[in-house]
């Protein structure tokens, strides 16, 4: 049995902190990470930038979280080993970075893993776009062709519009696009 949650609103780092904090989780037995906090900070920032650029309605999904119930027999095994093995298998199978935590609920009736994972992979080299000529963006962040399109009646660039001068970086990506396998579906990992 498992549930899937989307981590939204610049909260992947907050959610990681919450599930891995002994101060906030009284029945926390083990935690495990395949990527450091810099990875998750960069992922959150780039996801938010992509979301704003897309102009999509709703909320930005920075990462996904699975909550996987384990049979109580797993309480007999060493918690760190259970969590490490499970997380590394998920990482190997899907090729994604993860943070995980092994918990019991307050009544100790539900032994479970929280597994947060990235839908994007780190690129081998950052993809940096440098303006070969001046680039103009309107108030919504949409690229326009000419300076005239973002200039007000007073001859000044309108508030909220942006000009990127020739030779400046106007876009950079550290991550791939989202893996579509994870969109709107549950992942069943019990067939291992």
Residue ranges of predicted features:
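N-terminal nicking endonuclease/strand-transfer module with a His-rich metal-binding environment
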Residues: 1-4, 8-191
